[in-house]
Amino acid sequence: MYIKGEHEFYCCGARVKISEGGIKILTEPLVKYCPLHEALTGIKKIDVEAVRRTIEMKVKGFGFCCANRLFKADPVVAYGASEMMQFWLEKKNVECAVVVCEGAGTVITTNGNLVQAIGSRLNGIIKTSPIPEIIQYIEGMGGKVLDASTAKIDQVEGVEKAFESGFKRIAVTVAGFKADVISKIRSLEAGIKAEVTIFSVCNTCVDSEKAEHIIKADIACASASKIVRSKVGGKALLQLGVTIPVYALTERGKNLILAYLADFKDKLVVFRTGKLPYSAEGRGPVLSEHVKSCCSNCCEDIKF
């Protein structure tokens, strides 16, 4: 597996740059331990070298940022954005999805398997560059790349293109570090009279200002963020999971999640509560010390 192009993304809250020249960890990880990360990689203690090993595993294991990237549509996590979008597309709950893929940028597709194959093990992509083989595969599977010449990531323009293509019920992912895009999509939605389901993802690095935008999403993943749990989770109508909770913030989001759960094969526990978010001490990620100190005042009621 050989890396092509240049790409930046977040992994465990660390900013990472990957290119033909190798893997560079640009910032320290914000997370010391994550149960989901351990389950997927076998890595318990997260530091700079652990982040490097994680990326190396992605490159070697499924060709992350490589010409021969593997596209597998098997489910990876129970409540993932791509898993849910795959289901919604298959059941016609939404008509198309606007997602992001390394080597391609913003992608518009009606193919649920393609959404899952792109997103199943993807990190929060900050910027990427074109990988022709990835673009060719996506287009061969019926996907439309927003800008094949630059691999531009622009979810607002992606939603616009989806609407111009005739779709009225659109699902879109928005990464937490670009949360202001959520507000822009809401403004666009009102103007074009479409129904846009916004799924907020990759929220480990979110600050309080970004959280104000995330509240406008339909569904939000808490990732490893105490701020999201505190500021966004308190607005939730429904919560999925405890370790890495996912919040339904609107009736539309709640109904889509309930549709997904109606077809879910594993056993479930459902109970009523007077207050969200629901948390259990010792069940969530462990943040690095400097992140803990930043969150201590606004999130002291949230227990990991």
Positions of PLM-derived features:
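Conserved mixed alpha/beta catalytic, RNA-binding, or beta-rich assembly cores of soluble enzyme
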Residues: M1-F304
